[in-house]
Swiss-Prot record:
This is Tachykinin-like peptide-XII. Belongs to the tachykinin family. GO terms for cellular component: extracellular region. The modification Phenylalanine amide is found at F13. The keyword Phosphoprotein does not apply. It comes from the Eukaryota. It is found in: Secreted. It comes from Phoneutria nigriventer.
Length: 13
């Protein structure tokens, strides 16, 4: 489970 980009993208929301 490695959500690097997702974490950043979701972080904006």
């Amino acid at each position: 489970q490695k959500k690097d980009k997702k974490d950043k993208f979701y972080g904006l929301f």
